[in-house]
Amino acid sequence: MSRQWLFSTNHKDIGTLYFIFGVWSGMVGTSLSILIRAELSHPGMFIGNDQIYNVIVTAHAFIMIFFMVMPIMIGGFGNWLVPLMLGAPDMAFPRMNNMSFWMLPPSLTLLLSSSMVENGAGTGWTVYPPLSSGTAHAGASVDLAIFSLHLAGISSILGAVNFITTVINMRSSGITLDRLPLFVWSVVITAILLLLSLPVLAGAITMLLTDRNLNTSFFDPIGGGDPILYQHLFWFFGHPEVYILILPGFGMISHIITQESGKKETFGTLGMIYAMLTIGLLGFIVWAHHMFTVGMDVDTRAYFTSATMIIAVPTGIKIFSWLATLHGTQLTYSPALLWSLGFVFLFTVGGLTGVVLANSSIDIVLHDTYYVVAHFHYVLSMGAVFAIMAGFIHWYPLLTGMVMNPSWLKAQFSMMFIGVNLTFFPQHFLGLAGMPRRYSDFPDSYLTWNIISSLGSTISLFAVIFFLFIIWESMITQRTPSFPMQLSSSIEWYHTLPPAEHTYSELPLLSSNF
């Protein structure tokens, strides 16, 4: 047991560990979100303390980003699928792969500790000074959160190095870069973004750590520092981070839509690759659109507005290529395809509100209102999470060798779809009406939409529980697939379901007409 799970060097076992960890963290993060919506379901205090409320909001963000989406998408799907799609026997650095995983549980422990000692870190996930300074947040909470981020960051950087090396060096004969599966491309681009952005975050939070404990003044005006510097450093990481969260989802959706359409390949494969590369590149030069309210020059604001809008172009290319891939097929609405179609539609809606927020003059009004919350939850809660659900259902027979009940999955999709839209769509109206983020109380003019929003979150909670039940049911009944439904254009399906512990012991050769 300990050799298989504690000291594993097998990409499949490590990927499974990532999945288990991500699902567990996701349940913690979901519980926190239910607490937030319970507080906001009615005017007046429920938790009774704004500091505690902000600690819950901060922990919800950190857990969902660093311990749910990234471990499942990059660690879970990445580890499982990249070697199988490359025809590689394993990752390039199998032991480092194991270390990448085992840095995450200590990191999560540090984060949860930071919420439990002293007053907790009630800074929001951005951890802006002066609120996160030693004066406003005395005690160990913010320091523990910083150490947690350091560990999660090191884990991601090591994983990124591993994926890049694997894809460069371990492709089978015949898999040239232009024939690399789109999911593998998306993981490589994600890894490059991680490699370039995380060190900047590490620098920023290390400076914050020394400001708090070693009497430096990087972000303290009294000693000649500038809190705005922290914002620039943080968002230079933070904006690529949101593309890191969604890019592997793009890759998975491409595979699912292609295979469900019965097509040989995605429409415009090369265009899809260039679109992802462009999104990754542009993601690094738009960071200050998160800071339109800090008083930048008008020409700076004009630049960041236009640069942000340019990102909509490659994103649009991806959306329309997916629609073109679907074009002309007699669709069977399988659960994985339902999630993918939901992804395409809701991600587009989230992208449109993003274009609205890109206008610096409009953003002055909408900044730090629920409009922003609605925007990023549409792209994360209905982009990243829908992609995870689609991918998990699609590759579940490959991961486990079992099949889930498709009728239940469709019912569960309907529940979740209604739940998330009921939760986040009204938040656009709240934001336009000026309801600010990160406050636990609100005037009763906002009551109706908040009640509807909280009702939606309850529906989503039941949908998540239903999904766990569906997984449980599939595992106790042990239904096995008769044959893989997929086309031969995806080589991960050329195995027993689930694959043997060691696949590709003899390296495959891919012919030019696969």
Curated annotation (Swiss-Prot):
Binding of Cu cation, residues: H239, H289, H290
Main location: mitochondrion
Annotated residues for binding of O2: Y243
Residues annotated as binding Ca(2+): E39, G44
Cellular component terms (Gene Ontology): mitochondrial inner membrane; respiratory chain complex IV
EC number annotated for this UniProt entry: 7.1.1.9
Residues that span the membrane, as ranges: 16-36, 55-75, 101-117, 144-164, 182-202, 233-253, 267-287, 304-324, 337-357, 379-399, 415-435, 451-471
Residues annotated as binding heme a3: H375
Free-text function comment from the UniProt entry: Component of the cytochrome c oxidase, the last enzyme in the mitochondrial electron transport chain which drives oxidative phosphorylation. The respiratory chain contains 3 multisubunit complexes succinate dehydrogenase (complex II, CII), ubiquinol-cytochrome c oxidoreductase (cytochrome b-c1 complex, complex III, CIII) and cytochrome c oxidase (complex IV, CIV), that cooperate to transfer electrons derived from NADH and succinate to molecular oxygen, creating an electrochemical gradient over the inner membrane that drives transmembrane transport and the ATP synthase.
Name of the molecule in the record: Cytochrome c oxidase subunit 1
Species whose genome carries this gene: Aedes aegypti (Yellowfever mosquito)
Classification of source organism: Eukaryota, Metazoa, Ecdysozoa, Arthropoda, Hexapoda
